[in-house]
């Protein structure tokens, strides 16, 4: 923000979801923005969720602890949480669930790039079609997408599967929240 203030000495609109901060604790940037921009900052809170079904939004709200979030009353399937004995077993179930609904956009979201590449290799070995999104990807395609939770920020998918192999990761809670908020219609929280 300091660099932006120096490069662009103008009025700015900064939008974001404080629950999606990429560190171990949620930070409200409006607390330190006045110091950076050396002026008064006007804060508007938008608390209505339009993206997800009620079931997914309630799940995300429980993860974040943000009880002020107002939900759009569009109901869908409940969130499915499953633990698997192996990565392969997890992906077996993901592929079954993907083929049941035939959504246009489906994502398998992982904690790390290494995990995403592992998922890609397993899918490739099984002859599955998928798209991998990394830092250099410039286009979004329909179908099955594999990427990390942090590269999925700003994207939305009809159906989302988390493939979390490391629950002890300090970013687990943020990863779970960000992944949940990417899902429009169905969310499967899968881990080993």
Residue positions per predicted region:
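Conserved helicase motor core of SF1/SF2 NTP-dependent helicases
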Residues: 1-192
């Amino acid at each position: 923000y300091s660099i932006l203030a120096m490069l662009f000495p103008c009025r700015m609109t900064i939008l974001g979801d404080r629950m999606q901060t990429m560190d171990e604790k949620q930070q409200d940037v409006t607390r330190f923005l006045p110091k950076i921009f050396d002026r008064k900052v006007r804060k508007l809170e938008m608390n209505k969720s339009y993206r997800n079904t009620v079931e997914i939004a309630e799940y995300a709200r429980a993860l974040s602890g943000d009880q002020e979030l107002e939900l759009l009353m569009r109901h869908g399937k409940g969130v499915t949480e499953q633990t698997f004995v192996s990565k392969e077993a997890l992906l077996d179930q993901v592929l079954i669930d993907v083929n049941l609904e035939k959504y246009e956009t489906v994502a398998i979201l992982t904690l790390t790039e290494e995990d995403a590449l592992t998922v890609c290799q397993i899918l490739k070995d099984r002859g599955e079609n998928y798209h991998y999104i990394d830092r250099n990807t410039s286009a979004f395609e329909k179908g099955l997408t594999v990427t990390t939770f942090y590269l999925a920020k700003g994207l939305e998918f009809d159906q989302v599967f988390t493939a979390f192999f490391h629950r002890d990761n300090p970013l687990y809670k943020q990863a779970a929240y960000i992944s949940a908020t990417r899902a429009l219609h169905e969310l499967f929280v899968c881990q080993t």
